[in-house]
Amino acid sequence: MFQIFDKLNKLIVEWLQKPIKEYENRSPFNLRDLESVMQPGDILLVDGNQRVSSAIKYLTQSTWSHAAFYLGKNNKFSEKFGTDAILIESDLIDGVITVPLSKYEKFNTRICRPAGLSDFEKEKVIEYMIDSIGLDYDRKNIIDLMRYLLPQPPVPIRFRRRMLALGSGTPSKVICSTLIAKAFQSISYPILPVIQKEKKLKEVSYRGVKHSQYIEKEYYHIRHYSLFVPRDFDLSPFFSTI
């Protein structure tokens, strides 16, 4: 039974990875441009060209279907990962792996950079990503995406994020954006928190005269990592678009 399921799983993966027709590269940047700008800790958002990319872009109403973490080039990690510009990403087949930045040279991309991170915090995020190499891709995500492609459902916008809480949530199995979200949440760095505003009536005194006024407070609640999608890094006020 397991062999049948595994074979079916592979067939679905192959189908999801087939390229879509009429993909257009609108990016004016080449590999050298990307390498000159990117810094370790940056996130590369990718407008993918596969069927799986279409499902993610449809559900998120966004250009971006994939997110990868930039490790850098010719730095202290080069001895282990090579001298090329290296990304860490979660792949549909191979799980969490390193790939050269050149993989996405012909794609539409955007660079998102976390703002205000100390060197220590950045190192912690990088360590988390490196320690994640070898984890499996969350295969429940494959079934979810297949469900939305056959055919693409007319889903109201307010329900799409709920549908994108993809995967089983198993710590040893990840998808691209949830892995990166977990890495930044490991240092309590906000990405796109839920903001709760609360007004309270408070009695204050000014020059001996008492009066009441409303005090407004904002509370930032961290989203569960499984709810993050690639476009959230683009929308986040805590990430700069380069």
Show where each model-derived region lies:
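Cysteine-nucleophile amide-bond enzymes
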Residues: 1-242
